[in-house]
């Protein structure tokens, strides 16, 4: 379900202030639900995934997405494949 247009996008207040003040430095944030806005283009943002901070460089294609979409919280682990052996 999408967010109402009259409410606008969500951006954490402290994250917004850091973007306005520090244009070129790395910004560390725990706010995964903040929306990427055009002012963020070209900034490195360290997004917390619950254990570590993952460094993400913001580009134009990311505008309108949430920060949490680029820092996965779960590690993908696949099952091992069976190896077919040649018969002698």
From Swiss-Prot:
Signal recorded as keyword: no
UniProt superkingdom: Bacteria
Disulfide bonds: none
GO BP terms: ribosomal small subunit assembly; translation
InterPro entries, A to Z: Ribosomal_uS19, Ribosomal_uS19_bac-type, Ribosomal_uS19_CS, Ribosomal_uS19_SF
The organism of origin for this protein: Carsonella ruddii (strain PV)
Residue stretches in coiled coil: none
GO cellular component: cytoplasm; small ribosomal subunit
Entry keywords, A to Z: Ribonucleoprotein, Ribosomal protein, RNA-binding, rRNA-binding
SUPFAM superfamilies in the cross-refs: Ribosomal protein S19
Gene: rpsS
Name of the molecule in the record: Small ribosomal subunit protein uS19
PANTHER family: RIBOSOMAL PROTEIN S19P FAMILY MEMBER (PTHR11880), SMALL RIBOSOMAL SUBUNIT PROTEIN US19M (PTHR11880:SF8)
Pfam families per UniProt: Ribosomal_S19
Function: Protein S19 forms a complex with S13 that binds strongly to the 16S ribosomal RNA.
Gene Ontology molecular-function annotations: rRNA binding; structural constituent of ribosome
Record keyword rRNA-binding present: yes
Similarity section: Belongs to the universal ribosomal protein uS19 family.
